[in-house]
Amino acid sequence: MSMAVASLRLLARGGRRRARFPAPLSVPGGRAAFLSGAAEEVAQADAPPPPPPGRKVLESFREEFEIGGRVISFETGKMARFANGSVVISMDDTHVLSTVAAAKSSEPVRDFLPLTVDYQEKQYAQGVIPTTYMRREGAPKERELLCGRIIDRPIRPLFPPGFYHEVQVMNATIIMVNVISSDGKQDPDVMAANASSAALMLSDIPWNGPIGVIRVGRIDGNFVLNPTVDELGLSDLNLVYACSRDKTLMIDVQAREITERDLQAGMKLAHAEAVKCINPQLRLAKRAGKKKKEYKISLISDKSYEKIRTLSEAPIEEVFTDSTYGKFERGEALENITQSVKAKLEEECDEDSLKFLHKAVDTVRKQVIRKRIIEKGLRVDGRQLDEVRPLYCESSTYPILHGSALFSRGDTQVLCTVTLGAPGDAQRLDSIVGPPTKRFMLHYSFPPFSINEVAKRGGLNRREVGHGTLAEKALLAVLPPEGEFPYTVRVNSEVMASDGSTSMASVCGGSMALMDAGIPVREHVAGVSVGLVSEVDQTTGDISSYRILTDILGLEDHLGDMDFKIAGTRRGITAIQLDIKPAGIPLDIICESLEPARKARNQILDRMDQEISSARAFNDGSSPRLATLSFSSDSLRKLLFHRKKIEQETGARVSVSDGTVTIVAKTQPIMDKAIEKVEFLVGREIEVGRTYKGVVSSIKEYGAFVEFNGGQQGLLHISELSHDKVSKVSDVVSVGQVLSLTCIGQDLRGNIKLSLKATLPHAHEKKDLASNHTDPLPSQEVVGWTAVENMPSKDANAEPSISKDEDNMIEETPGCSTPAVIIRSAAECDAQDVTNDPKKKRPKVAKSSPKLSKPASERQEVKRTSAKKTSGASTTAKKNKKEKADSSNDVLDAIPEQNKSNIMNYSSPSNFRSGSMKLGDVVTAKVYQIRAYGLVLELSDGVRGMHKFAENGHKDFEVGEELLVKCSSFNAKGIPVFSLLD
């Protein structure tokens, strides 16, 4: 029996091994196939023993509910069991862990609530290794700070008054990868806020929750609950709403000019759906929650408060009644009152009252200002409840910048600047949801001098990040799409002076700066802050009376109940942020606040339109230039390794993305230089029949290889060099020479075939050029072989001056601003190189083939000088000479009579010889070669002349191009030197 049991155990273990490591052939039924008879006894023996008495068993609790067709669950007891409270919330494949911990000391350590909310998105959540040097998680990102604010703002008002113990809420986003994996559709910020509420409910920390948080979108006029990231891209509303069962706690909105009525409908729907998150938290807290711990509440006694109120109420009311006080004068007067009360308490040695002095005086200030506003409708600066402070707008504050504006509202002043950059300057976002880059940024800065304080500047500040993001959301709705305006835009908002509502002032200043930069925004965006002062019925806890304040001061923000920031255009709202101090405000009051905000916003927009109402011209000197070039993906590979080099050489910014190259430069010359380098490096798609510029890279017996179109090689066969027969390639072209060539196809091997003669006119085309022009020509403008006005010299007696540079023979001719230079032919240049460099071998000149046919002009010259010419040949030569003379006379007859008097020494190309040309003769020549320093010009009868480029002269010539030139001098060999005529 024991052997049978041992065999069964062995087989059972083998079954377990097969279950863990499946083999191609497995026993059907696995281990269950052997559990019969004695096997059942073995199974009972192998079962895990029951836990010893007193040992805790891991137990988890779970609550599920549904919102918008998606199932959401709260789970506790499985993870982070040592924390004061921990909850894992799940929706689809997104899971968020929220933990809560409080300081162990029962004594308060501060006179305010030291609440800290840390939100983290670990890179492992999306299956990515961090890109930092140490491959660890880096400092908190902007998105993490913003999500932390989303959690902090609704839960902070629900802590009991006087609870000043340190509390920390930790949120770590965890996306668990299973066989399906996560698609990253859900933004976890709303889930984290709900999980934090549930964790606080489970903990022993006193907190008057729970809350419900929900996101609402709108697509094609229909509201969507908890939309995905893709749905938010189609939505014109992104509303994050937090509430208790009957009051609103937090609102955060980004919209595309939604109307006040539609926004109210969205908030009412959000409230009804967010309440569904509350009951599951209550059920979970009832099953697994801890008993609330008794903490010592830091509250002043009624006796001490009455004593301080009696000493300070009258002088405080006197200060608030005087509307002539400014921010700092009022603050100094209130501080003097506090010091006076402190001196009296010190005389009486009232230590209990001194301990809560500042808190009690602040409470007295709040009661005085509330009573004055509610009963009399008067504010501390003398304004009416719906009155906006004086406005000041100024655009183009610093014209050298791309865009700048200065905006002031009362004592609040903000300087906004705009900087435009290339698409590659866009901010790269390393978040688990959302787009990978952001092309529009608004950075808000609150320096200490704006409130006349001394402080150290640290890293990212949550307040600065939050205010900058709010203003960025407000302006994003009016920006042109990326296809119309591909620039990266950065707005920098510097607070110069602060007395309330600096974020809304940043919206106004940023809108004017965008227009000043020439960005085609549709219209202005303005923002204003709305406040609330209310009285609460102590018996019911409801608000009995209230007043809505428009454009609140910093003091009214501090002593009031609400800071409701609303930004938008005349069409509707683009951004909203609501922060409150009491434990919730009814939604009806919030909806009522939208109307006074709309009126104030339109008033501010009117003043902004008076300063600048539309975008300025974008082509001024301060605006950068942008060009977009399209290439194939294969061609762009050449640019990836040379992009940085082009940027260093030109100073332009080059961005490569999806077959498109975007170049941004400060000036047009820099832009042209960068485009030239990019096109030369990448090249264009080669088309048969299209003309390209190329550089001769090597010369062979059968032709020349030319580099063109971004480094591509083409063959210029010897038969494509000229319409006439060529015996040697080097007689026509040389290495390094720039040519204009036409693509004529490919050979059997796939090599690109180029042609030079396709760009040159035939002999009969050149002959008939003059006879085709019959229209009268304007003064100083010549087409073809027509003469031009000879520009006289300023000094008729001036002698030609010759440079001391005998090698280059640079000559200057009177009456011509461009210096004329003797430029030798290719053979002469080679001979000169050998003379200058004795080590260089003289190139061997091959004898001409006896079968080489000479040009027609040379053949005519031979016939005129040979004693053996026939009578038929003589007749033909005379006939050709007569036709050329008649064509020149026809051209001269086509010139108006008033211009003929200005023509001097015109020589027809068929009437002159190299020995008969005179200084001042005006002729039409053809570009024969293009050198780095000048042109080799071809005249008739085999005569060639030269022209040198000026230092900054025009160098855009093509081989075969006809130019109008004037003979300015001759060199020692009798070669004519020409200067160009405009």
From Swiss-Prot:
<feature type="domain" description="KH">
    <location>
        <begin position="624"/>
        <end position="678"/>
    </location>
</feature>
<dbReference type="InterPro" id="IPR012340">
    <property type="entry name" value="NA-bd_OB-fold"/>
</dbReference>
<dbReference type="InterPro" id="IPR027408">
    <property type="entry name" value="PNPase/RNase_PH_dom_sf"/>
</dbReference>
<keyword id="KW-0496">Mitochondrion</keyword>
<dbReference type="GO" id="GO:0000965">
    <property type="term" value="P:mitochondrial RNA 3'-end processing"/>
</dbReference>
<protein>
    <recommendedName>
        <fullName>Polyribonucleotide nucleotidyltransferase 2, mitochondrial</fullName>
        <ecNumber>2.7.7.8</ecNumber>
    </recommendedName>
</protein>
<dbReference type="InterPro" id="IPR001247">
    <property type="entry name" value="ExoRNase_PH_dom1"/>
</dbReference>
<dbReference type="Pfam" id="PF00575">
    <property type="entry name" value="S1"/>
</dbReference>
<feature type="domain" description="S1 motif 1">
    <location>
        <begin position="689"/>
        <end position="757"/>
    </location>
</feature>
<dbReference type="Pfam" id="PF03725">
    <property type="entry name" value="RNase_PH_C"/>
</dbReference>
<feature type="domain" description="S1 motif 2">
    <location>
        <begin position="920"/>
        <end position="982"/>
    </location>
</feature>
<keyword id="KW-0507">mRNA processing</keyword>
<feature type="transit peptide" description="Mitochondrion">
    <location>
        <begin position="1"/>
        <end position="39"/>
    </location>
</feature>
<keyword id="KW-0378">Hydrolase</keyword>
<dbReference type="GO" id="GO:0004654">
    <property type="term" value="F:polyribonucleotide nucleotidyltransferase activity"/>
</dbReference>
<feature type="compositionally biased region" description="Low complexity">
    <location>
        <begin position="868"/>
        <end position="877"/>
    </location>
</feature>
<dbReference type="GO" id="GO:0006397">
    <property type="term" value="P:mRNA processing"/>
</dbReference>
<dbReference type="GO" id="GO:0006364">
    <property type="term" value="P:rRNA processing"/>
</dbReference>
<feature type="compositionally biased region" description="Low complexity">
    <location>
        <begin position="846"/>
        <end position="855"/>
    </location>
</feature>
<keyword id="KW-0677">Repeat</keyword>
<keyword id="KW-0819">tRNA processing</keyword>
<dbReference type="GO" id="GO:0000175">
    <property type="term" value="F:3'-5'-RNA exonuclease activity"/>
</dbReference>
<keyword id="KW-0809">Transit peptide</keyword>
<dbReference type="GO" id="GO:0005739">
    <property type="term" value="C:mitochondrion"/>
</dbReference>
<dbReference type="GO" id="GO:0008033">
    <property type="term" value="P:tRNA processing"/>
</dbReference>
<dbReference type="InterPro" id="IPR020568">
    <property type="entry name" value="Ribosomal_Su5_D2-typ_SF"/>
</dbReference>
<dbReference type="GO" id="GO:0003723">
    <property type="term" value="F:RNA binding"/>
</dbReference>
<comment type="similarity">
    <text>Belongs to the polyribonucleotide nucleotidyltransferase family.</text>
</comment>
<dbReference type="InterPro" id="IPR036456">
    <property type="entry name" value="PNPase_PH_RNA-bd_sf"/>
</dbReference>
<dbReference type="GO" id="GO:0005829">
    <property type="term" value="C:cytosol"/>
</dbReference>
<keyword id="KW-0540">Nuclease</keyword>
<dbReference type="InterPro" id="IPR015847">
    <property type="entry name" value="ExoRNase_PH_dom2"/>
</dbReference>
<dbReference type="InterPro" id="IPR036345">
    <property type="entry name" value="ExoRNase_PH_dom2_sf"/>
</dbReference>
<comment type="function">
    <text>Involved in the 3'-end maturation of mitochondrial mRNAs, rRNAs and tRNAs. Functions as a poly(A) mRNA 3'-5' degrading phosphorylase.</text>
</comment>
<dbReference type="InterPro" id="IPR003029">
    <property type="entry name" value="S1_domain"/>
</dbReference>
<keyword id="KW-0548">Nucleotidyltransferase</keyword>
<keyword id="KW-0269">Exonuclease</keyword>
<dbReference type="InterPro" id="IPR012162">
    <property type="entry name" value="PNPase"/>
</dbReference>
<dbReference type="GO" id="GO:0000958">
    <property type="term" value="P:mitochondrial mRNA catabolic process"/>
</dbReference>
<feature type="region of interest" description="Disordered">
    <location>
        <begin position="792"/>
        <end position="814"/>
    </location>
</feature>
<dbReference type="Pfam" id="PF01138">
    <property type="entry name" value="RNase_PH"/>
</dbReference>
<dbReference type="Pfam" id="PF03726">
    <property type="entry name" value="PNPase"/>
</dbReference>
